[in-house]
C-alpha cells in the first residue's frame, strides 16, 4: 500500500505524535485518499490489536510503520461513523475513531468575528460541547492557543495521557478535536506543548464547570438543559428604566453567609447524600450550603428584609477561598463549591419568582498566576502583557489582561454576555475599575509605562470597558452595570456614544469614606466636620451614584460597622441606625453588605459565617427591623428614589447648623410634586422645640423615627406628627417645631390635615 518514502514519512509522523509534537493529526490519521484508493489509519497508543468492524465481520489493521499507527487499505471512503475494536492487555472495547471526524467546528465567520474581538457568543464554539456528528454522540473540544506546538485533550478517557488525543490546529490558532462517547460529567484538561517543548496542563478557559478546589480539572457540562420559568420577569426587566426604580442591594458572600454541619449533609432528590465541601480547614466540622439550600434559606431572608437585589461577590470558579472570589480561573463556570451550574440557574430563577434581582461581581481587571489558569497559557504571554510594568499587579500578585489583543477582549466581553444569557443575571458590579483605568495604579515611579500621549490613562482598558458596556446594553437593555471606581475619572456613567465608559451606576466611594470618617468621630466634635456630611451633594449629579457600605469596609482591621461607632453600646446602636437611615434618605441607589443589617460585631471573615446568635438580643433585632422598615418605606415613597439623578429630587432646608450637628433637607418627586422632610441629629443630645422650615403649611406626619422603641431607641419623638406654624426660618414662611431624638433621623411627610 505504501512506498518506502511513505513508510519513512509515516514513521516520522508517528514519532511526532508519540512525542506530542504534532499539530496536524488529520493530515495523517483517519481516512486518507491515496490516488484512487483509501488508506485508513488509526492512532492507538499501547494497543495490542485494532480491527475495523464491517457489516459482515471485521478487518484487522496492521502497524508496520509505527507501533501505534494501525492501518489498512480500502476501496472506498469509509466515512466517519465506522467503528473499531481495540485490544489492550487482554481487554477489548469498541469505539468510534476520533480522527474520522474532519468537521471544522469554528467556521470562517466565527474565526473572523473572534479575530476582530466581536464574537459575542464565542462560548458557543470554544470549550467542550456535547454534540452529535454523523449520528455519533460525543464532545467537540475547541481551544485558542496560537503559540502552542501541539495540544492534546487529557482526562479520564485516556488516563490523563496526552499521547492519546492530539488536537487539530486550524486557522487563527484554534485547536479542535471531536472525541466520541465522552459524556456529561467527564473530567478533562488541555495538555499544551510550547514551541520550546515545555508542557502545561491547563483547565479550559471556556469550561462551563470545574472540580471543587483544590482539584483543578474542567468538567463536561451542558448549556441549555435548564427550563427557565422567569419569562415574565425577563420581559419586564428589559422594558424598564432601572434608574427610575428603587434599588436596594444586599451584598453578600455565598460561602460565609451561613454554614451547615458536616453531620447534616445535603440530601439529593434521589435520596443520596452529597459529598460535603468543608467551609474552612480550621473548621472541618462545617460545610458550605449548596445552591439549593441557599435557595431555601437566603432568598426568603432577603425578601423579608425588603431588598430589591442580591449582589453576589464573585462566584466564577476560583481556587483560593481567601481571594473572596476575586482571583478567577474559571470565567465561564459558577463555582462548584456550592453545586452545579443548573442549581445556580434555579437559584436565580427562584430569586426572580420572589421579585429579587441578581447582581454578580465581575472581575475583568486581573487574574491569578495559578499554573492551571490563563497565565503563560500556551508557552507565551497570551492573555497578559509580557512586560510586567503593564502586565502585572505586584501588590496583588496577579496578572493584567492584555486589552489591546482582540481575542482577549472577546473572551471577556463574551463572558459578560454569557452570564446574562445563560444565567439570567440582572446586573454586574465591575471590581477595581480604577486599577484598569490608570497605568500607574499602585505603581512607584519607573515601574509603569506612559501611554502614547505621555499620560497615565490606559486607553486600551477604556476601550474595553466601553465595548463591554455597549455590548451589554445592546443585548440586555434592562441590565445594571455598576462601577467600583474610586477616583474622579470623568464620565463613568456617561453613555459610550458621548465619550463615557457606559456604566449606568457608580459606587459613591467619596460619600462612604466621608460618612464613615464622620461617624467615627466623637459626637461632641462632629460640629467641626459638618462638611463630611454635606459635601457629597456638591458633586452628586456629576454621575449616577450608588451609595455603598461594602465588604471592603469591614475587613483588614477596619472593624465592622457597629464597632466603628464611638461611645457605649447604646450610642453605637443609635449611631448605626442614624447612619443607615441617612443613607436610605440620601440621593442614590443603595448597597449594604451582609451582617450590617443586624449589627454584626466581628469583622467579616471569609472562613466563618455571620453572627446569627446576635439576633437573640433586642438591639440587634432592632437594627434588623429598622432595615426591614427602611426598605419598605423606601420602596413605597417615590420621593426617595424617583429623582435620584435629577437635582429637583433633593433640596437642602438647612445644612449650616454645625453647632448642633443637625441637618435637614427635602426629598422630592417631580411627577406628583410630593416631598418628604428629613431631619438628622448627629449628637447624643435631645433637641427640644427645634425649628425646621417647610414650604407649605399643614400637618407633617412622622412616618419614620430611628429612635423608636421597636428599634432599640429611647422612643423620643413627635407623637406621630406636627402641624406647622407661621415662622420665618430657612427662607420659608412656615416651620415645624420638633423634638429631635439623640443620634437620630426623622422622616416626615406632608399632609394637608392630620386625617
From Swiss-Prot:
Q: Which residue spans traverse the membrane?
A: none
Reactions catalysed, semicolon-separated, are: Transfers a segment of a (1->4)-alpha-D-glucan chain to a primary hydroxy group in a similar glucan chain
Primary enzyme class:
transferase
Q: Which GO terms describe its molecular function?
A: 1,4-alpha-glucan branching enzyme activity; cation binding; hydrolase activity, hydrolyzing O-glycosyl compounds
A Gene Ontology biological process annotation? glycogen biosynthetic process
Q: State the pathway, as annotated in the record.
A: Glycan biosynthesis; glycogen biosynthesis
* Pfam families per UniProt: Alpha-amylase, Alpha-amylase_C, CBM_48, GlgB_N
Q: Which GO terms describe its cellular component?
A: cytosol
Quote the EC number: 2.4.1.18
Q: Which domain of life is it from?
A: Bacteria
InterPro entries xref list: A-amylase/branching_C, Branching_enzy, GlgB, GlgB_N, GlgB_N_E_set_prok, Glyco_hydro_13_cat_dom, Glyco_hydro_13_N, Glyco_hydro_b
> What Gene3D superfamilies does this protein map onto?
Glycosidases (3.20.20.80), Golgi alpha-mannosidase II (2.60.40.1180), Immunoglobulins (2.60.40.10)
Q: Which UniProt keywords apply?
A: Carbohydrate metabolism, Glycogen biosynthesis, Glycogen metabolism, Glycosyltransferase, Transferase
Instruction: Quote the catalytic residue positions.
Output: 431, 484
Subunit annotation: Monomer.
Give a short account of what the protein does.
Catalyzes the formation of the alpha-1,6-glucosidic linkages in glycogen by scission of a 1,4-alpha-linked oligosaccharide from growing alpha-1,4-glucan chains and the subsequent attachment of the oligosaccharide to the alpha-1,6 position.
Q: Which NCBIfam families match?
A: branching_enzym (TIGR01515), PRK05402.1 (NF003811), PRK12313.1 (NF008967)
Similarity comment: family membership = Belongs to the glycosyl hydrolase 13 family. GlgB subfamily.
Put simply, this protein is called: 1,4-alpha-glucan branching enzyme GlgB
Where does this protein come from, organism-wise?
Answer: Prochlorococcus marinus (strain SARG / CCMP1375 / SS120)
Taxonomic classification, please? Bacteria, Bacillati, Cyanobacteriota, Cyanophyceae, Synechococcales
